């Protein structure tokens, strides 16, 4: 299905649309809108290769989308947006769309997938700045509540995402919300071979 409500009028952010990174079509089932002003933002890492160029990032994202749709049976790539090592923001499900990223919170949050494994290091400054600017844009357009709290997936699910080192960094941020009351534990989905 076509993705609507796309707004890339965020000052200073280098957006890469689904068309630009070569996305497959979303499956139409259960592709619902989230509410305006979601109260939670989740940072994830893709737990795989990093990328430093648009072509390399696009290639990695296409592989993740195929895994999420074909191996895991999801409607689309899990994340609302992905952030590459080049500092660009890649459109996943986009604004105001339910993701498949954080059990129990998919319909009341947005997710940013940082491309790479951040268990032993923090994403680079360009990536962190892009995420900060994306949140501010989301607030300005009404997609994210001005009173949002920021979390890693491990604050809501039994996962190590977004990696130990990145998570320690997140805990120092002003809007960090910590472990959430509704905490969901399930077996992790099957691995993606990216």
PLM-predicted stretches and their roles:
Residues 68-75, 85:
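Glycine-/small-residue-enriched capping loops at alpha/beta junctions
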Residues 35-69:
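Active-site acidic/histidine clusters and adjacent loop/turn architecture
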Residues 1-46, 84-194:
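Basic/polar, cationic surfaces and motifs that engage anionic cell-wall
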